[in-house]
Amino acid sequence: LGDYCRYSSSLEPLLSEFAICLIARIWGSGYEWKVHSKIAIDAGVNEDMIESISLGKKPSHMSDEQHAVYEFTMTLNRDRKISDELYNKTYEILGKDRIVDLVGILGYYTLISMTISISISTVPRVTCSPRMALQAIPIHPKKDICTFFPSKADCVI
């Protein structure tokens, strides 16, 4: 499933990585953010958009396709459903195959974010300002697991 989502999806990398960054931000997954924000930029996502996502803000100057991915992703995660109106708007822009692949990508990377949060359950939980999402560092020397490493001024422990 992961290989399909990353390499064979009908969504071009610019859109799939944009969606993955949204999921990483929604879940506060430092590892996913660190890896996929860089891949997204390499795939053509504007750095200002990545910065906006990291701050929990809606990016400006999105293409119609990026806007469709953003609205679909944020609505599905917030409301746990998509209205007929939003589905139809998204369908007009992305089409059925890309909507199906978008839902698969969102589900898969939500699973990854959940798994990572369980994997680091022995690490004290820290709640930080959104800007800190950009500062993920390794926390386990033998595993590729990262967490946020903010300053004390930005955190509640």
At which residue positions do the language-model features occur?
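Hydrophobic alpha-helical segments
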Residues: L1-I157
